[in-house]
């Protein structure tokens, strides 16, 4: 059986994602569609609008055959690590293609990535007045004639780099689908039936009805920031500089900025971010670092987790079950479908902890991991 892979967040699953899934199946004619989806926390270091089980159910209902969780240690990362981890897992699941959306579906991203520039020591760019991303895009344009700036193009480029870096060009074909109707960062609902996840989340936060934009029913917005801030404020107030410095991705003296910020007694999460923010750090990076601190994820713990990946099964159809049976013994990484306390404390330690905190700030009662079984359809 041949499988195609989709790398997703589904935050929430909406009509654009449905189009992507159906188009991927149409283009590849694959026997099985595998969705690799971020769990309860998404790449920007924020909690997903609804938990991984409801989003996995939406994917299965829409026609996915297998849904696996992209573990926290890959999901809540800068784009390059996110892409490298996702491609690594899908490669082990033996997909023959990865289908992603892009603003320029006519671009050969593998060829583009093969011309990746090295801007280190490049005196043509004034790094004091431009971000690394701007310098990089300009260097790439200089070499290829293409200016990389759109969100989905950047992701496609990251997947292409991951395929090249892992020597998978003979094994996995990267194909892109043109994004339709809504831009990735669009803030407002449009008159059609496809809106960005950003716009849908914003509309939900304002009490608007979004039923025409998503097949997911009963979506609700939870104002999580106050709970998140209280937990984080306690952690930052009681941890010393050495403890904060030991956290993954806390470097370049960031611990001093964070400590100084919390000592100014910010009133909410937004004010805390504003006190830490500088040109050196994007808001996305700060979100991620603060979540790493909240979850007390040390450098060695994160590195160890990334060295020992696994496939966490969230849902499957009969065809998906057949695929797993056919491929039994051929995956290098273990497949986890049932979680007991021992597994939660060892293999799934980071994701288990992330699920517990997610439940607290989102006011969820259902367990996220222990004794949860994959969705079957």
UniProtKB/Swiss-Prot annotation:
It catalyses: cytidine(34) in elongator tRNA(Met) + acetate + ATP = N(4)-acetylcytidine(34) in elongator tRNA(Met) + AMP + diphosphate. Keywords: ATP-binding, Cytoplasm, Ligase, Nucleotide-binding, RNA-binding, tRNA processing, tRNA-binding. Its EC number is 6.3.4.-. Pfam families: HIGH_NTase1 (PF05636). ATP binds at residues 7-20, 101, 152, 179. One of its GO terms (biological process) is tRNA modification. One of its GO terms (molecular function) is tRNA binding. It is found in: Cytoplasm. Gene3D superfamilies: HUPs. One of its GO terms (cellular component) is cytoplasm. InterPro entries: Rossmann-like_a/b/a_fold, tRNA(Met)_cyd_acetate_ligase. The keyword Phosphoprotein does not apply. Catalyzes the formation of N(4)-acetylcytidine (ac(4)C) at the wobble position of elongator tRNA(Met), using acetate and ATP as substrates. First activates an acetate ion to form acetyladenylate (Ac-AMP) and then transfers the acetyl group to tRNA to form ac(4)C34. Belongs to the TmcAL family. NCBIfam families: PRK13670.1. HAMAP family: TmcAL. This is tRNA(Met) cytidine acetate ligase. It comes from Oenococcus oeni (strain ATCC BAA-331 / PSU-1). The gene is tmcAL.
């Amino acid at each position: 059986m041949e499988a195609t892979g989709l790398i997703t967040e589904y935050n929430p699953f909406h009509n654009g994602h449905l189009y992507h899934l159906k188009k991927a199946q149409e283009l590849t004619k694959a026997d099985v569609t595998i969705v690799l989806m971020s769990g309860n926390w998404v790449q920007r270091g924020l909690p997903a609008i609804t938990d991984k089980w409801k989003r996995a159910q939406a994917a299965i209902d829409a026609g996915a055959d297998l849904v696996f969780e992209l573990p926290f240690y890959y999901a809540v990362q800068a784009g390059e690590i996110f892409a490298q981890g996702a491609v690594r897992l899908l490669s082990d699941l033996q997909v023959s293609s990865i289908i992603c959306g892009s603003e320029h579906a006519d671009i050969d991203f593998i060829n583009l990535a093969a011309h990746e520039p090295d801007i280190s020591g490049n005196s043509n760019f004034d790094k004091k007045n431009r971000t690394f991303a701007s310098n990089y895009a300009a260097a790439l344009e200089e070499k290829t004639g293409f200016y990389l700036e759109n969100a989905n193009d950047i992701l496609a480029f990251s997947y292409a780099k991951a395929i090249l870096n892992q020597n998978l060009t003979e094994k996995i074909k990267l194909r892109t689908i043109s994004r339709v109707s809504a831009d990735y960062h669009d803030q407002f609902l449009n008159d059609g039936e496809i809106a960005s996840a950003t716009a849908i989340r914003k509309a939900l936060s304002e009490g608007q009805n979004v039923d025409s934009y998503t097949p997911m029913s009963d979506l609700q917005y939870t104002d999580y920031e106050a709970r998140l801030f209280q937990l984080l404020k306690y952690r930052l107030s009681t941890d010393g500089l050495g403890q904060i410095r030991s956290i993954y991705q806390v470097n370049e003296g960031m611990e001093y900025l964070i400590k100084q910020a919390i000592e100014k007694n910010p009133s909410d999460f937004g004010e805390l971010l504003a006190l830490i923010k500088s040109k050196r750090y994007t808001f996305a990076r700060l979100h991620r670092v603060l979540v790493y601190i909240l979850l007390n994820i040390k450098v060695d713990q994160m590195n160890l987790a990334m060295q020992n990946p696994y496939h966490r099964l969230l849902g499957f159809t009969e065809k998906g079950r057949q695929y797993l049976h056919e491929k039994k013994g051929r995956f290098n990484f273990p497949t986890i479908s049932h979680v007991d306390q021992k597994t939660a404390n060892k293999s799934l330690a980071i994701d288990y902890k992330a699920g517990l905190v997610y439940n607290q700030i989102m006011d969820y009662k259902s367990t996220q991991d222990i004794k949860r079984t994959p969705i079957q359809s």
